[in-house]
């Protein structure tokens, strides 16, 4: 199953499926420490494939990771609703 399919499955879980969410977090992200939790929905263009989570990371609803390259989130990080983490850029020259 691809990371995008796992992300879709994560976003479709019921609130009572906490064990399933924990399992999918371990599968979606390249690295996920202990006690990580992301409130669905979660969005990433690579499904979290380039995201590294430290220990005890919490993200509220609507986390978006533009993970075209690696994103590192350190231990004991808490994020509010609708946070965007973007590693991509566009050409900066007007030419």
Predicted segments, located by residue:
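N-terminal start-of-domain structural block
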Residues: 30, 34-44, 48
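Weak global preference for isoleucine
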Residues: 25, 38, 71-73
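Terminal amphipathic alpha-helical/low-complexity segments used for targeting or macromolecular assembly
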Residues: 1-35
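Flexible, glycine/small-residue-enriched loop-and-beta-strand segment within the central core
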Residues: 42-53, 58-95
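Short gly/ser/thr-rich secondary-structure transition/capping motifs
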Residues: 16-20, 37-43, 60
